[in-house]
Amino acid sequence: MRLYFRKLWLTNLFLGGALASSAAIGAVSPKTYKDADFYVAPTQQDVNYDLVDDFGANGNDTSDDSNALQRAINAISRKPNGGTLLIPNGTYHFLGIQMKSNVHIRVESDVIIKPTWNGDGKNHRLFEVGVNNIVRNFSFQGLGNGFLVDFKDSRDKNLAVFKLGDVRNYKISNFTIDDNKTIFASILVDVTERNGRLHWSRNGIIERIKQNNALFGYGLIQTYGADNILFRNLHSEGGIALRMETDNLLMKNYKQGGIRNIFADNIRCSKGLAAVMFGPHFMKNGDVQVTNVSSVSCGSAVRSDSGFVELFSPTDEVHTRQSWKQAVESKLGRGCAQTPYARGNGGTRWAARVTQKDACLDKAKLEYGIEPGSFGTVKVFDVTARFGYNADLKQDQLDYFSTSNPMCKRVCLPTKEQWSKQGQIYIGPSLAAVIDTTPETSKYDYDVKTFNVKRINFPVNSHKTIDTNTESSRVCNYYGMSECSSSRWER
């Protein structure tokens, strides 16, 4: 990937520099848009219901309120023009709610929504939209200062707030999520399988949402399949706020999905990996425009990963790590398979990434019909990264401290009690404003054009950008450094 900077390009404000806004730069400015380009509110409705008064929910106990909410949704959706449901102030418990067409939910500002305990070990979502049925014209919005989704006391780590599938013309807005380091992004903009093809969301707005205490590898939103969506005013503490990482294996099998015509504005990260991430994996994605990105004590503000090809051993064959590597190289050539890693099936299924060389990737495309993913035109305007000491960092990123932090100061390793898979994540100083690990010389590269990037309070010898040409070497003892205190781990 090649990062483009107009006029000066990453001035460190700590050293007294200053940058003009992207509008002042002159040559390039963001596309304009209006809300109605993404979501159109209803002009006529048949009913207005209250969840407590009309359907008997109780916001003052610990009982499951899912049945009452589902009955209300069903009743509204049966009306030709649908209607609005008010969730009045109180504490409610929901799980597995199926949203339907023409239902518009409004939630008062003192509402607390908690997950109903299930305990079956499966993945759970509070609300599913267009997963099992087509949904058209839907909204779920907080009133006033917004409501709270509270996961803090839940023992269920397999939770998400929303999963979106085949939904069109929708708006989700105005609430806070108190997470408990669950192992999903809180809003999954996903795909769903029906009648031999995949379906995904089109025409929507997701905005005014803050997430606290997210797990490093997840965060607020992940997009798999989406067309014409506006993401606005989003903030994730921990992980990634807007993770455009299109890695759903259903999409790989169908060769369908991906994201196109995406707009984002005011995307923020604190104490996490990044505010915005591009990770195409194996999908050909379309155009993306992002404006006003900021990070405080994050690894970076913007992160871009290369697309790649990954080959899985067949489920009906038994392989070792070495035998699957040899099988791939017998098709693609020596040196074209990286070391495989286990992917289930009793420890006998393996995945091997194809080496990031055009000759190897060309053979993989010819042999398997798969090539690295990419994006279309990507422009990111007005990026501000503020240095801090509590960023989420991946193990391979620690090597970039070779010039800026060679003693690996203030980097800690979570204890096994905090995170059992030691070596996956660390907490330490911010690295750069932009991290770009895509190959510059490959024809499978994609470009991110970035305008007006600022760094605040970064040390003098820190990196401006990190890319494939950045010097790196191992300076941290990956497993011998100090343990993270509970205050650093728990935010």
Curated annotation (Swiss-Prot):
Keywords on record: Carbohydrate metabolism, Cell wall biogenesis/degradation, Disulfide bond, Glycosidase, Hydrolase, Polysaccharide degradation, Secreted, Signal
One Pfam match: Pect-lyase_RHGA_epim
Catalytic activity: Endohydrolysis of 1,4-beta-D-linkages between D-galactose 4-sulfate and 3,6-anhydro-D-galactose-2-sulfate in iota-carrageenans
InterPro entries listed in its UniProt record: Pectin_lyas_fold, Pectin_lyase_fold/virulence, RHGA/B-epi-like_pectate_lyase
Keyword Secreted included in the entry's annotation: yes
Record's signal peptide: 1-23
EC number(s) per entry: 3.2.1.157
Entry GO MF terms: iota-carrageenase activity
SUPFAM superfamilies in UniProt: Pectin lyase-like
Major place of residence: secreted
Cellular component, GO annotation: extracellular region
Subcellular location(s) per record: Secreted
Annotated TM spans: none
Cysteine-cysteine disulfides: C269-C298, C336-C360, C408-C476, C412-C484
BP term (GO), one: polysaccharide catabolic process
Keyword Hydrolase attached: yes
Domain of life: Bacteria
Assigned protein family: Belongs to the glycosyl hydrolase 82 family.
Function: Hydrolyzes iota-carrageenans, sulfated 1,3-alpha-1,4-beta galactans from red algal cell walls, with an inversion of anomeric configuration. Also active against hybrid iota-/nu-carrageenan, not active against kappa- or lambda-carrageenans.
Protein name: Iota-carrageenase
Annotated source species: Alteromonas macleodii (Pseudoalteromonas macleodii)
Gene assigned in the entry: cgiA
